[in-house]
Amino acid sequence: MAGEEMNEDYPVEIHESLTALESSLGAVDDMLKTMMAVSRNELLQKLDPLEQAKVDLVSAYTLNSMFWVYLATQGVNPKEHPVKQELERIRVYMNRVKEITDKKKAAKLDRGAASRFVKNALWEPKAKSTPKVANKGKSKH
């Protein structure tokens, strides 16, 4: 009976999409409650500047994305709204932070280890009298 009432409010075709949306909103709500449980200053004190930037960017992106969804649910085209430009601006900064993170993770040359590796990898002939005699014999002919 309750299922029949639901079908009167919206088309049956979108029931699965609405259920998924409701589930996603519940997950977002849980995450926001978790984030809000800790004071922002307390959270940022535990992080290095790069991690702080990541938290700020993810927060800004999340809020703007939620506003994008809100606009869409109100029948406003978010692609024509300034929120699209704001999301692009945040993406640019996220890419910059990613580049910095990747540079930090990039392999660094350990000169001592490289020197030892090259030294041990190069072939050195052993000092024996036989190869010298063979070489002398070849050079005379």
From Swiss-Prot:
Induction: Up-regulated during adipocyte and myogenic differentiation. Residues 1-100 are annotated as: Required for transcriptional repression. Keywords: Apoptosis, Cytoplasm, DNA-binding, Isopeptide bond, Nucleus, Phosphoprotein, Repressor, RNA-binding, rRNA processing, Transcription, Transcription regulation, Ubl conjugation. Phosphorylated by PRKDC. Its main location: nucleus. There is a cross-link at residues 119, 126, 132 (Glycyl lysine isopeptide (Lys-Gly) (interchain with G-Cter in SUMO2)). InterPro entries: Exosome-assoc_fac/DNA_repair (IPR011082), Sas10/Utp3/C1D (IPR007146). Monomer and homodimer. Interacts with NR1D1, THRA, THRB, NCOR1 and NCOR2. Associates with the RNA exosome complex. Interacts with EXOSC10; the interaction probably mediates the association with the nuclear form of the RNA exosome. The homodimeric form interacts with TSNAX following gamma-radiation. Interacts with RAC3. This is Nuclear nucleic acid-binding protein C1D. It comes from Mus musculus.
